[in-house]
C-alpha cells in the first residue's frame, strides 16, 4: 500500500464567523461525532448557511469526508463552496464522467439491441482520478460526489498495489519503467502528450498522470538509476521544481496484474461454458452463439491488451468476488473512520435506494438473451443496506428530512436562524373560488414593487391555461415545464430575476435549488390535493422559495385544510416565531439577500462578435457556422471546467448537444 503523507489538519478559511444558531448546531454535531454517535440530522431551513456549518464540522472533527448530493449541478455548487473554504486541503469532485450515456440494452418485443454509447468528459475523468489518488495518498480529503459514488469502481487494493513509486537514486532501468507504465494502462504517445500518456526521449521519460491536466513529470535516468524527477508544465516542458517522491496511479480504475488476469480469464471461460450449456439445453442456439462470439472476443482483448470495452461487466471475476457480493465503490477508497454527509437527504437517500432495481432490470434482459454473462449483474450500484454497511458516521442534511432519515436517528439538530435575519414567510389560505382574480391582484401589487412571483400548479393543462389567462390580462409570464432543457431553464430564471417577465409558473420545478431573492410571492394552487407535490415535505420546500425576500409571502388556494397543509403551516409558524424572537433579542433588521445575476453564455459567430444564445438563430445557421459555434462552445466549456464552474460547463455541454442534433 501507499504510505500516506503526514496528517495535515483541515484548515477552514472564511471571512464569516458562525452566527445565529450556527454555533450551537456546530457544537452539537461535533460533540455527537466525538461521542461516537452514528447518525444525526441537521435540519436546516432554506438560507441558513448549512454548507458553512458542514465546513465547520469537517474542520473540527478532522476526518476524511464524503459529501453526497442528488445531482451534478448541486454537487458542482457544493464543490465550489468547499474549495473556497478549504484552499489548502484536497477538495475533490466525483460524479458520472459521461456527457452522454446510452446504456447497453435489449428490447425483446422488437428484437432491438442497443449498444452502449457514451461520451466521456475528460475533465471529470481527471477529477475522478484525482479523488481516488488523493484518498490513497492523504487524509485531509473532502470528496463531493453524486450517487455515482455507489457504482462499481474497481478494487482499491489492486489500484494501490499497481501504483508505480519512483524516487531519485532508485535502481530501475528505463525499459522496466516503460513496461510498468504500459501494465497500468498508460499509452506511449510521443506526439500528442495528454493525460494517461508517456513519451520517451533518450534517457528521459515524461509521464502525464491521469489525475492532472496542466502538470506532468519528467524522470531522468543515469544508466539504470533515476537521476532526478521534475514536475513540468505539460505544454511547454518548463521545469516547475524537483520532487523527491512520485507515485503514479493506474490510468484506469479497472486494473489487474498479469497473474490475476489469467485467473480472471479462467473464471470467465468457466462461466461461459456453464451458460452455453444452459442455453443449448433450452434450445436457445441464437443466444448461445451470440454469447460465445462476444465473450471470446472480450477474452482475446483482455489477454492481449489487458482491457476491453465493457470490462466492468467482468469486474466480479477481476476483483475475485463471489456471486452477489457487492462491488468495490468509491466508499472503499476511504479509511474506515470517515464521515459521510448527505445533502438534501430527502432526495438523495431515495436515489440511493432506487439505483439498484433499475440497473438489475436492464441487465437481466441482456443476460437472458445472450448479450452478457450472468456475472454482469454484479457490476451494479450498491443496495441501500450495502451502502449502510459502509457508514461509520453520517449526517443527513435537509430542510425537510425524509421518513428514512427520521427512522435512523432521534438526534436532530436544528438550524433555523438566517445570518441575514430573514424570516420564514407568512402564509395565507384562501378559497379556490375566484382565485384567478385574487391572484391577478396580488401579482399586480408585486409588479408595482418590482418583485417577482412563483405559481405552482398540479397539472400541465392548468399551468398552460393559467399562462394564457395571465398573458391576456397583460401580465409578463412564462411557464417552465419538464421538456425545457437545462440551459434554457437557467436562462428563464435569469430573465425572471432581470425583470424580462414577472411571473413564473411551474409544476415540480419550483422546489430545491431554485434561488431567486426577487421572488416575494409564492402561490400554491390546489394546495388541498394530497399527494407527492402537496405533502408536508413538498409544501415546506415550495414555501422556502419565498424565504429569500424580506417581504416573502405564500398563498395557498384550497377549499379544505389537509393534514399536510396544517403541518407545513404549523412548522413554518414555529420557525418564524423562533426567528422573530432571535432578531428582537439581537437587534437584527431582516434584509433581502443580495445575489449577483450571472451573465448568459455567449459564443463566437464567424464575425467573432460575442452573441448570446437568445440573439442567435441556430436554425438559420449554415452547417459550417454551427460547427464554428460548437468549437467555440467546447473551448468555453473547457475554460468553465478549469475554473471549477461545473454548472456553467454543464449548461454549455447541453447547448453543444442541442446544436449537434440539428445536423
Swiss-Prot record:
Motif Beta-hairpin: chain residues: 97-120
Keywords on record: ATP-binding, Cytoplasm, DNA damage, DNA excision, DNA repair, Excision nuclease, Nucleotide-binding, SOS response
Highest taxon listed in the record's lineage: Bacteria
Stretches with biased composition (Basic and acidic residues): 1-10
Binding residue positions for ATP: 44-51
Record domain Helicase C-terminal: where: 435-601
Assembly information from the UniProt record: Forms a heterotetramer with UvrA during the search for lesions. Interacts with UvrC in an incision complex.
Recorded family membership: Belongs to the UvrB family.
Function: The UvrABC repair system catalyzes the recognition and processing of DNA lesions. A damage recognition complex composed of 2 UvrA and 2 UvrB subunits scans DNA for abnormalities. Upon binding of the UvrA(2)B(2) complex to a putative damaged site, the DNA wraps around one UvrB monomer. DNA wrap is dependent on ATP binding by UvrB and probably causes local melting of the DNA helix, facilitating insertion of UvrB beta-hairpin between the DNA strands. Then UvrB probes one DNA strand for the presence of a lesion.
Protein's UniProt name: UvrABC system protein B
Originating organism: Streptococcus pyogenes serotype M28 (strain MGAS6180)
Gene name in the database record: uvrB
